[in-house]
Amino acid sequence: MSLLVRAALAAAVVCAFAALAPVAPAAAPVPPKAGQVVTFPFPAKAPVVVQLTGVGAARERLSALLKGALGNDAADVEKLIDDGLKQLLADRKLTAVPKDGRVYLAINDIAALFEGTPAVSLLVPVTTYKEFRDTFLTADEQKTFEAGKGVDEVKLSAFGNDHTVYMVDLKEYVALSPDKGTADLYTTKFTHASTTGMPSELAKSFVGSDLALFVNLDLINDTYGEQIKNFKMLIDFGIQQAQMGGVLPGIGKKQLDAMKGLLQGAFQALGDCHGLVVAAEFRPEGLNLRVQAQFAEDTTSVKVLKAETPGPLADLGKMPAGLAQYMGTKYGKSFVEAARGLNAEFAPADDDEKGNAAVEKLQAALVAAGPQGEVAGIGGAANTLTVAKYADAKKAAAALLGCYEAMSAGGKVQGTILKDAPKVTADAQKHAGFTFAEVKMEFDFEATVKDLPEGVKENTIAQLKRGVAERQSIWVGTDGKQVVQVVAKDWAAARAAVDDYFEAKKPVGEVEGFKVTRKQLPADASLLLMVEVGQTATSILDSLRMVQDAVPGFPKIGKAPELKGPPAFVGLAITLKGDTATANVFVPGAAIAAARKIVAGLLTNID
């Protein structure tokens, strides 16, 4: 067993107490109130810390989540968890561990993880040190206990092996570590970490979650800044070499430049960032996952963030029900420009200088038109509706149509190569106060995948056809306030989609599953994505079936069980506000139940 696994073993053993905790309603973790300080038992200089907010309490909240998601079937899942963790605990008792006490796993030195014994420590809340020793240690382990001057030593048994662990009595906590030097640290007068020493938003997320990881990037940047800089240079060099050697098929110069810009931005953000929290919350309605970063004042990243004004994106709920994905965005100018480069919605061939110059100018005009938010519903190759608001919608519509007109054969629209130049018919239709132009395109799937390995070409074409019709019609219209784009099989279908949205015919916002997930996400967001579970799961499984024929040894996937009942949605909300960037993913109980049903069915059908 590796030293790293051995170091984490104590955490697994103590957290297994959750399996033995009595199941009863438990209040969610409470984040610190303004002015209220939470002092932690680990050193302020610990670069990485994991927290479990009460092994017993977290277990109770997980039980409530499972019952809400699985109903009577939750008992079977809980029994599997309980049996496995009871076996891990063996003869140990954890009566000396308060069920609401916070447990911490601190990485005291990142470099030491890869050099000898890892400098990690597990901090467990206890009633008393003596009671913990007498109840947690087995009879055989107690015989190996050796008292020291502040640091005691014991051999813990797990998986048939003995592991030396050092223990320190911290009164309300006991510190355990496989490294003697780390244990010695807890006998000295060290500076304790606290919520006052953490960025305010990160402190709330860290303390207010059931399970959370905190990364102190201020400390990491100070300690490893030079190594991070060298790593960035290595990646830059690797991208350049890959492009020169043709290792990145299908990626044009503009996309490569955008990738480099993204890389530059990522490392800039890393250097500007105070810290990062990755957290999970067990809610009765489902599971919420959060990734949050907070940045230092007077940095490039904060200047960009403070220009953002997230909103409720309420218009997303007006999209017609029955589609697979719904997405709304509200970004400022800087983010719109960055996304434009990465998305490459319009990418003339690299040797089409005239087309590239025209698209560059027109996309700049699109940004200058003042985007104020966009919502979209996506249902397949010929079923997409997008509604975008602009300060100058007529200018935006003209720029968008100009981009289509600037494309020629060999260029890419939405990543797929055009067989011929798009055919644009101005003023093709008028409806509901909108004047629509019609854009007809024909794609060349074979040319799109020509640089890919032979084994994956056929499957990639099949994937493309799921999202893009080989012959596609798009209607682009404006009423002077907003710009509408509709991908449909014909004008009748396009007109119906427009009516469904503007007349609120069966809007997705009235679907119960949509409402449940939206309520659990932040009220304001810069990006909101809602994914319908049934259609998305079917699409993913179909994609995996395509892969199984191309990859030797890939499991043969049978037919998944049909998902019945009302639609459920998994939601993602990204919020850029002030000095903080936050991503929340909410998985409702209905989605968890659907996932269990699919997995259980597949396990009986995989060859």
Segments predicted by a language model, with ranges:
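N-terminal secretory signal peptides that target proteins for export/translocation
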Residues: 1-5
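Short, surface-exposed beta-strand/loop micro-motifs that present aromatic residues
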Residues: 38, 105-113, 161-171, 374-375, ...
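A conserved glycine-rich beta-strand in the N-terminal activation segment of trypsin-fold
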Residues: 159-236, 311, 467-557
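Long compositionally biased, domain-poor regions of proteins
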Residues: 104-109, 361-385, 389, 393-396, ...
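One face of beta-strands
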Residues: 46-50, 103, 120-124, 174-175, ...
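Bacterial N-terminal signal peptides
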Residues: 8-19
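Signal peptide processing junction and immediate N-terminal pro/mature segment
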Residues: 19-29
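Structural boundary/hinge residues at secondary-structure and domain interfaces
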Residues: 28-160, 202-279, 288-382, 394-426, ...
